[in-house]
Amino acid sequence: MPLLNSLATPYAEALLQVTEARSESQTVAEQCKQLLSVWDSSAEFRDAMVSPVLEPSSKKKALQGLLAEQVTPSLMNLLKVLADRQRLQAFEAVMNRFLELYREQQGITLAQVRSAKPLSEAQQAALSKKVQAMAGTSKVDIDLSVDPALIGGFVVSLGSQVIDASLAGQVRRLGLALAKAS
C-alpha cells in the first residue's frame, strides 16, 4: 500500500490546493465520499475504469457522461487526468488520501464504526454524540460500515483507540477469560 500512497499523494495534494483556491473543498470531500461508495458498490464501473483494454479517451467519455452533473469541474479534471495517465487503478487511494488531507487541514477526526446491522438515524445520532465526546471535538467524520461477523453491537475505531461493544468481542473475551482460568 505504501507505493499506492506515494502515487496517490501528489494527485490528492493537487486536488486539495485547487479546491481550496476555489473554496469548494467541503463540496469535493462529500463528492469523493459518494464516488468511493459507487466505486465500492459497482464492480462493473470499477472493472471498466481499470481495464487496460479500454482506451483512456473512452474512459474519459464515460466519466464525463456519468459524472459531469454530479461532480465539480475540479474533481472531473482530476478523474480525466487519472484516465489519461492510466492511473484509475489508484482512484480509491487518491480519493482516500484527499479525504485524509482534507480532514487533517480542517481538524476533523475520523471515527470508523462497524456495526452488525445498519444503524437507524436515531442510533447514528446517539453514536455521533458519544464519539464526539470521546474525541473531545465536534468535528468528527463518522465512517459507517456493516460487518455481520460482529453478530451484534458495534466496534468504534478512533485513532489508536478501539471500543469493542460487539457480541463477537464479548464471546472472544469470555473465551480468553475461560482459557486463563483453566
UniProtKB/Swiss-Prot annotation:
SUPFAM superfamilies with a match to the protein in the record: N-terminal domain of the delta subunit of the F1F0-ATP synthase
Give the UniProt keywords, A-Z: ATP synthesis, CF(1), Hydrogen ion transport, Ion transport, Membrane, Thylakoid, Transport
| The UniProt record lists the keyword Cell division | no
Q: Name one GO molecular function term.
A: proton-transporting ATP synthase activity, rotational mechanism
Q: Which InterPro entries does this chain map to? A: ATP_synth_OSCP/delta_N_sf (IPR026015), ATPase_OSCP/dsu (IPR000711)
Keyword Glycoprotein among UniProt keywords: no
Compartment(s): Cellular thylakoid membrane
From which domain of life does this come?
Answer: Bacteria
Give any Gene Ontology cellular component.
Answer: proton-transporting ATP synthase complex
Which membrane topology describes this protein?
A: Peripheral membrane protein
Xref: Pfam families: OSCP
User: Quaternary arrangement and interactors, per the entry?
Assistant: F-type ATPases have 2 components, F(1) - the catalytic core - and F(0) - the membrane proton channel. F(1) has five subunits: alpha(3), beta(3), gamma(1), delta(1), epsilon(1). CF(0) has four main subunits: a(1), b(1), b'(1) and c(10-14). The alpha and beta chains form an alternating ring which encloses part of the gamma chain. F(1) is attached to F(0) by a central stalk formed by the gamma and epsilon chains, while a peripheral stalk is formed by the delta, b and b' chains.
The UniProt family comment states: Belongs to the ATPase delta chain family.
Function recorded in the entry: F(1)F(0) ATP synthase produces ATP from ADP in the presence of a proton or sodium gradient. F-type ATPases consist of two structural domains, F(1) containing the extramembraneous catalytic core and F(0) containing the membrane proton channel, linked together by a central stalk and a peripheral stalk. During catalysis, ATP synthesis in the catalytic domain of F(1) is coupled via a rotary mechanism of the central stalk subunits to proton translocation. This protein is part of the stalk that links CF(0) to CF(1). It either transmits conformational changes from CF(0) to CF(1) or is implicated in proton conduction.
HAMAP family (alphabetical): ATP_synth_delta_bact
The name this protein carries in UniProt is ATP synthase subunit delta
In its UniProt entry, the species of origin is given as Synechococcus sp. (strain CC9902)
